[in-house]
Each structure stands twice: as structure tokens, then as C-alpha cells.
Amino acid sequence: MDQEHLNPEALNFPFPAIIGVDEAKKALLAALVSDDIRTVLIQGGTGSAKTTLIRSLTGISEREVLNLPLGTNDDQVFGIIDLEETLLTGERRMMPGILQKSDLNILHADDVNLMDHSLLDQLLESVNRQKALVEREGLSYEYRCRTTFIGTMN
């Protein structure tokens, strides 16, 4: 059976069945239930079930897990103001980035230590403020981002 026909739920290992990562599990559970915990960093060696653990969160939470690929740029993360539509309609229109799409969900970045540091700083600031600001061509757009950011690294 090829990948496109696999049930995405079948790819997720059950959260309770993952063993040997108790501290990481406690941190993730705390982040799921607390509005005050907005970021979690999990460090572990290759093959230590970091990504499996993050994916398993969909089985114990209503929240989706969105992945932030390494090499993603500012516009892909924060979104862009659709200047053409804004000029045509007179209303600011936003083309959302992954941060806006992750509102009320979980945003996961693997190898977070390899991310562009400036982008990571802006991302963490937005997550902690629960608001993101996009400024382009003299226009600005602010949106809520009540996301939980989880970074993993070796």
C-alpha cells in the first residue's frame, strides 16, 4: 500500500505507549493544559522518539500538529499582505503563513537549533505575545497566534 492511501491516524503511535521520555511527556502535557506554557524544547539523540512523541499529541488532544519545515522563510511563517487585493478592495487582505494557520493548535519545528536565529527570535516573540505583526510596503497587519510551539533538537 502506498503512502497516499495510508490513514494519517495510523502513522501516530499512541502517546501512553511511548516509554523512556517521561520528562518530555510531562512538559508536553503541561503545555497542553496550561495557557501560560507557550513553548517547549525537547532535546534528545537521534531515534529517541522526539518526533513520534509530538505526532502522538493528536491522539490525546483536539489540537492539530503543524510542522514548520527547516528553511522556511519569514513570509511562509508570518504570512504576507496581499497588496494587489488590498489595493483593489481597499481592505487589508492577508495571505496567512503557517503561524496564523497554527492558531489554537501546535506548531512543531524539528532541528530547531538549525533554524535561522532571527526568524526563530521573531517566532518565539510572537508566540509568547500571542500576536504577530506583519509590516510590508507601509502597511501593517496584526493577528492572534495562540499556538503552542514545540521545538526538537539533537
Which residues fall in each region the model found?
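Pre-Walker A (pre-P-loop) alpha-helix and adjacent loop at the N terminus of AAA/AAA+ ATPase modules
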Residues: E9-Q43
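Conserved alpha-helical scaffold flanking the Walker A/P-loop in AAA+ ATPase domains
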Residues: L29-L32, T86-L107
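P-loop NTPase nucleotide-binding module
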Residues: A30-S34, Q122-Q130
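Walker A/P-loop
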Residues: L32-L70
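Conserved Walker
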Residues: I37, Q43-G45, L87-I98, V112, ...
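Conserved AAA+/SF3 P-loop NTPase catalytic/coupling segment centered on the Walker-B
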Residues: G44, L53, N73-D74, Q100-V127
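AAA+/P-loop NTPase substrate/partner-engagement loops
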Residues: I60-T86
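Structural recognition of the conserved hydrophobic beta-strand(s) that form the central parallel beta-sheet
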Residues: H108-A109, V134-E135, T147-N154
